[in-house]
Amino acid sequence: MSCSCGSSCGCGSNCNCGKMYPDLEEKSGATMQVTVIVLGVGSAKVQFEEAAEFGEAAHGCSCGANCKCNPCNC
């Protein structure tokens, strides 16, 4: 079965899966620390985090063997 994921769930350069939010992309073999500075109302930050987590859960893809999406659900 051929698996050709689209722009929001496709392996990009260096076998990094393309995500809707590339800044939230996990790097394999590296530790990433994210610092969030919120200016304004605290509830806006909570809403953004929920939206970002939902976006990641909806795609749920990562680069597998031979630079192919695993699982391919696009």
Swiss-Prot record:
It comes from the Eukaryota. Pfam families: Metallothio_2 (PF01439). The keyword Metal-binding applies. The keyword Metal-binding applies. GO terms for molecular function: metal ion binding. Keywords: Metal-binding, Metal-thiolate cluster. PANTHER family: METALLOTHIONEIN-LIKE PROTEIN 1A, METALLOTHIONEIN-LIKE PROTEIN 2A. Possibly relevant to mugineic acid-family (MAS) phytosiderophore production in iron-deficient barley roots. May have a function at the regulatory region of MAS synthetic genes or Fe(3+)-MAS transporter gene by conjugating with Fe(2+) like FUR protein. Belongs to the metallothionein superfamily. Type 15 family. This is Metallothionein-like protein 1. The gene is IDS-1.
